[in-house]
Design a protein with these regions (language model features):
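WD40 beta-propeller blade core
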Residues: 92-93, 131, 175
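Extracellular-facing segments of soluble proteins and assemblies that are Gly/Ser/Thr-biased and enriched
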Residues: 76-106
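Acidic, small-residue rich beta-repeat scaffolds with periodic aromatic anchors
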Residues: 157-187
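Repeated scaffold domains used in trafficking and secretory/extracellular systems
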Residues: 8-10, 14-30, 35-37, 65-80, ...
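Short loop/turn segments that connect beta-strands within the blades of beta-propeller domains
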Residues: 44, 79-80, 87-89, 118-119, ...
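Aromatic (tryptophan-biased) beta-strands that constitute blades/sheets of beta-rich domains
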Residues: 56-67, 101-111, 138-150, 185-187
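Short loop/turn segments that connect beta-strands within beta-propeller blades
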Residues: 96-98, 134-138, 178-182
Length: 187
């Protein structure tokens, strides 16, 4: 679970692996948002609850298809009055004031693992590609390696440095790209 403080509010982002559409056994989220094909093929569900003085004042759940995701420290981020969240193949951007959906975008063909703020934009590390999004959810560029962007030997597969991003793929090839998505080197 991720917790954020926003003004006098606490925002919780949690994994909901047992959430089932139309079930009465779920927490009753006030809003539901779906990625592409998520109503037919839901893979992951992540809940957002907003608390004021230990009372839930608003909530929503996001549901998406693609590879399964969980909640970890870089699966979501708070950017001023917006919450950005990776759920399966989709990034959702919610307005904190009322948990309305500002935008959603399919940022990877498989799974969106992580999201980071980079100046006025966002960088996502996905299973198949690295994607740069602008503040309105438009894709600025995508970069894919020769294989899945995961490491089998516990090497750090994704690292943002001051001058670019280092990525390691499944075949242990390392790439460095700049913040415009251009390849600097491949080893």
């Amino acid at each position: 679970m991720n917790r954020y403080r926003y003004n006098d509010l606490i925002i919780e982002v949690l994994d909901e692996p047992t959430y089932t559409l139309s079930s009465t056994n779920n927490f009753s989220y006030s809003k539901q948002y779906f990625g592409v094909d998520a109503k037919k093929y839901p893979t992951s569900a992540h809940g957002i609850k907003i608390y004021n003085a230990d009372q839930i004042i608003d909530s929503c759940i996001v549901i998406a298809s693609g590879g399964a995701t969980g909640i970890h420290s870089t699966a979501s981020l708070l950017d001023n009055d917006h919450l950005l969240l990776c759920c399966s193949d989709t990034v959702f951007c919610l307005i904190l004031q009322d948990l309305e959906l500002k935008w959603k975008v399919q940022a990877d063909q498989g799974t969106c693992f992580q999201i980071f703020k980079q100046h006025d934009d966002y960088i996502t590390h996905g299973e198949v590609q690295v994607t740069k999004l602008d503040k309105d959810g438009n894709i600025k560029w995508e970069f894919g390696g020769g294989s899945l962007l995961v490491s089998i030997d516990n090497d750090e597969e994704f690292k943002i440095e001051s001058d670019g991003i280092i990525i390691t793929d499944f075949s242990n090839t390392k790439y460095k790209i700049d913040f415009n998505g251009k390849l600097i080197y491949k080893v």
